[in-house]
Amino acid sequence: MKLGIFFSVFFLAMIHSCLSETNEDKNLESYFREDDLKALSFGEYARAMMAESRKDNCIPKHHECTSRPKDCCKQNLMQFKCSCMTIIDKNNKETERCKCDNSIFQKVAKTSVNIGKAVVTK
């Protein structure tokens, strides 16, 4: 029973992740004409999406994104999120620092996959 609940929650989380679109996913279609999109196979379209997501102006994982919080790169199917924290230095001055990292949902999904793999392989 517990295993069934676990996999149903995991399945719903993966469906949610796959169906959620970012603005970049919607804007990708503007780079291609409609005829080009019809002519591309799924593999070619996926490669084009990955090439577009690796553009030079995106911020890689664990790099600072304080000035550009929406420019974090994508990795595989998931977009990094800019997570911020307040840091107090030696002079008791508060500054906000941000870095591109996986969101909480992505961390939970990745952990669920790892646990699922461990359960299946045993």
Curated annotation (Swiss-Prot):
Recorded superkingdom: Eukaryota
Cellular compartments annotated: Secreted; Target cell membrane
InterPro entries from the UniProt entry: Spider_toxin_CSTX_knottin (IPR019553), Spider_toxin_CSTX_Knottin_CS (IPR011142)
GO molecular function annotations of the record: toxin activity
Tissue and organ expression note: Expressed by the venom gland.
Leader sequence residues: 1-20
Domain notes: The presence of a 'disulfide through disulfide knot' structurally defines this protein as a knottin.
Known role: Potent antibacterial peptide with anti-inflammatory properties. Inhibits both Gram-negative and Gram-positive bacteria by disrupting both the outer membrane and the cytosolic membrane of bacteria. Also downregulates the expression of pro-inflammatory mediators (cyclooxygenase-2 (PTGS2/COX2), nitric oxide-induced synthase (NOS2), IL-1 beta (IL1B), TNF-alpha (TNF)) and upregulates the level of anti-inflammatory cytokine (IL10) by inactivating mitogen-activated protein kinase signaling in a lipopolysaccharide-stimulated murine macrophage cell line.
GO cellular component, one term: membrane
Species name: Pardosa astrigera (Wolf spider)
Family to which the UniProt record says this protein belongs: Belongs to the neurotoxin 19 (CSTX) family.
Propeptide: 21-47
Disulfide pattern: C58-C73, C65-C82, C72-C100, C84-C98
Keyword annotations of the record: Antibiotic, Antimicrobial, Disulfide bond, Immunity, Innate immunity, Knottin, Membrane, Secreted, Signal, Target cell membrane, Target membrane
GO biological process, one term: defense response to bacterium
Protein name: Lycotoxin-Pa4a
UniProt keyword Membrane present: yes
